[in-house]
Amino acid sequence: MHKTPDFTAPIFLNDPAAALLQVQRIYQDNVEFLRQAMRDFVGGGDFTHARVRACYPYVRLHTHSVSRQGSSQPTNRLSYGFVAGPGRFETTLTRPDLYGDYYLEQFRLLLANHGGELEVGTSTQPIPIHFSFAEHDHVEGSLDVARRAFMRDVFDLPDLTAMDDGIANGTHEPRPGEAHPLSLFTAPRVDYSLQRLRHYTGTAPEWFQNFVLFTNYQFYIDEFIKLGHAEMAKPDSEYIAIVEPGNVVMRRAGLNAEPIDELGHAPPRLPQMPGYHLMRADRSGITMVNIGVGPANAKTITDHIAVLRPHAWLMLGHCAGL
């Protein structure tokens, strides 16, 4: 017996804000369905013959021309917010709470450049149960070994075959009748990287800023922290907070602490690639990550930070980018 949320039929919208709102509704309804099912599962509910599944929202665009809407200029003069040719393009979406501004901008540009409507609906791509948990949910840890093993029979777990980088690497070839990709990263790939960023940097992805520095020199990190703390002492600083591993938040002088600040605790030891975030209100601040030694770390962290779509990143240190 399959347990699924009420199906949300696809709708066609020419208003970017309305399209984003529909994405938010589908995602929130489906994630909350999974969270409630998980609470029931942890509480000992009978799932002997049950299979629980909820899927990501999708956005789809149909276009019949490579030309821009209302213009004779080709889209190859644009850097983003367009598709390269006629056809059907779609992608799955996740975390509209984190990506809302980004999605809204992309929806607006797609409609401005191609006209028509955006189709928003429920995809067939399952949301892995681990990707539905809220930031500080740790419900799985309360399960015994047998119940934890039974999870895979009830819920969808992360599937690495759905998280490859074929689109971003330019090697993805749609099968006959399949839509072209509308984004570099699918929803499961994004969710996977958001989870890994928590693990590698010791900070939540919500803290990351749009300008990123990487280094393998601790003295750069020390100076960055010193600079951040100095900025927090200035009531008129353009920066509003600095966040360190363990989600430890220091707010600018004159700003009140927020409830989420109480959840931060300095870890007993630093994570593999500790992250530090000097934040502006519009996310145009600076994130700095100590990638440590070795080219594998550099590739790993950039693979994951890429899903945040930062404006720029820069490596500091003569061997930091090998």
Predicted regions and their residues:
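Accessory terminal and edge-of-domain segments that mediate assembly/interaction
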Residues: 1-312, 320-322
